[in-house]
Amino acid sequence: MTNHEQVLTDYLAAFIEELVQAGVKEAIISPGSRSTPLALMMAEHPILKIYVDVDERSAGFFALGLAKASKRPVVLLCTSGTAAANYFPAVAEANLSQIPLIVLTADRPHELRNVGAPQAMDQLHLYGSHVKDFTDMALPENSEEMLRYAKWHGSRAVDIAMKTPRGPVHLNFPLREPLVPILEPSPFTATGKKHHHVHIYYTHEVLDDSSIQKMVTECTGKKGVFVVGPIDKKELEQPMVDLAKKLGWPILADPLSGLRSYGALDEVVIDQYDAFLKEAEIMDKLTPEVVIRFGSMPVSKPLKNWLEQLSDIRFYVVDPGAAWKDPIKAVTDMIHCDERFLLDIMQQNMPDDAKDAAWLSRWTSYNKVAREIVLAEMANTTILEEGKIVAELRRLLPEKAGLFIGNSMPIRDVDTYFSQIDKKIKMLANRGANGIDGVVSSALGASVVFQPMFLLIGDLSFYHDMNGLLMAKKYKMNLTIVIVNNDGGGIFSFLPQANEPKYFESLFGTSTELDFRFAAAFYDADYHETQSVDELEEAIDKASYHKGLDIIEVKTNRHENKANHQALWAKIADALKALN
């Protein structure tokens, strides 16, 4: 044992213990040499749960999914060099979707930077504006001041990551050799005796009385709508429904709002706006005077287009932090306050005669017609098309199941075909940067928190993150993956690129012709290829009772999927025109 090893051990023990005391319970470690002392010390901690993922890109998204589902800060650790760069996609997603990650990168000491040392690159501010904060940590030193410094940065990292708006932070640790700390006796047995832990308290933004009264006045007796995009706050669901009923306003609820599957059926929750807001004749009858938007922008493009063309209205965007979430540039009033506070204070101050019953009835009538057509079409078809897959998941998922939804077509199919249901289903997705990468790993991370967990994903997105399946095999995780295999990029069939047949398949369709049964075998998953509704139901039933990884593959046709969507939308449009 040398003095260097003791200094290294004490310094890192102080930092790690403070992370744990501030609320960190899990760390995802990517193996490497320079990060050895941090990895060993984390593994030694009696409370910290460790997951080791050999693929840094997968590790980043696994941590993201775990933090998203648990709403706790999760630590990521890697060695120096390009390992840290592989975290970048997950860091960007965490930043945009406000997920608390604490990214720790080991680095060469200062004397080995920019001199051609092996496995070394410039890691300072590596993630740029995609993190809330960056710190290049000091080298370990043997002094009380530096122990306090290490503890202080542990608390500070958690505080910044968890403070509204939540997000990732990056700490870079330059470390000198030798890199093996002292583990006997445990470095954590006496931790906390020399220095007190920092207690962190959080508050939320509120509005002053005059702003509240102004908002109440502007909403009373008006034709308004709530637009609720992705927002993972269960505590908002019932208060939002209650306020909507009092105002007589519809809630246009994105699948990731939580309102389509929070355990109750409410007619104020509108789930088929994507279908009927395509029609100009219908849109003209649904022009509001007030819009109040919560969460990020919903996935629906017809809804976005409708909101963009509204004019001469009050358009409130509510955000608890400092974000400016208004991509359509329609906001007239940006409200930075806690959402629950706003809902409660409006409920308390809104007069009982504030509603316009005819206005709400118009919305619910259109929605009822559209929903009944969707449900009837899905009930009557025996073809296992993409919409039918979503409808069957809606029917078959058990109470309190989790559903992680892939980007591209899956989230849009869920928007169309997952109507409101009186079951509690937790829906999650990576809708920050909206990438198709890292979705398998994110779902596996979320499966640590939610059980049973299902993943609905396209074939290209699944292929993109097959490496992530190693975590399921290694830790015997329970996840059921439903692959919608339309052999390529199905969403491009709905975009203008589809009108360029000369290059469409080579540049956008991108057929891979992969057989995923071999991927299932490689990672010890139970594999089910389903070609009928009965086979899908049987596979989901088996997977619900099986402990481990299940892969259910459904092969569909991109061109038929587009035609089916268009036929459904046309049928809804005709029915609504007849209603008028």
UniProtKB/Swiss-Prot annotation:
- Keyword Cell division attributed: no
Query: Known SUPFAM superfamilies for this protein?
Result: DHS-like NAD/FAD-binding domain, Thiamin diphosphate-binding fold (THDP-binding)
Q: Name one GO biological process term.
A: menaquinone biosynthetic process
What class does this enzyme belong to in the EC scheme? Answer: transferase
- Read off the Pfam families from this record: TPP_enzyme_C, TPP_enzyme_M_2, TPP_enzyme_N
Q: In which pathway does it act?
A: Quinol/quinone metabolism; 1,4-dihydroxy-2-naphthoate biosynthesis; 1,4-dihydroxy-2-naphthoate from chorismate: step 2/7; Quinol/quinone metabolism; menaquinone biosynthesis
> Which PANTHER family does the entry link to?
2-SUCCINYL-5-ENOLPYRUVYL-6-HYDROXY-3-CYCLOHEXENE-1-CARBOXYLATE SYNTHASE, PROTEIN PHYLLO, CHLOROPLASTIC
Q: What is this protein called?
A: 2-succinyl-5-enolpyruvyl-6-hydroxy-3-cyclohexene-1-carboxylate synthase
What is the native source organism of this protein? Listeria monocytogenes serovar 1/2a (strain ATCC BAA-679 / EGD-e)
Name the gene: menD
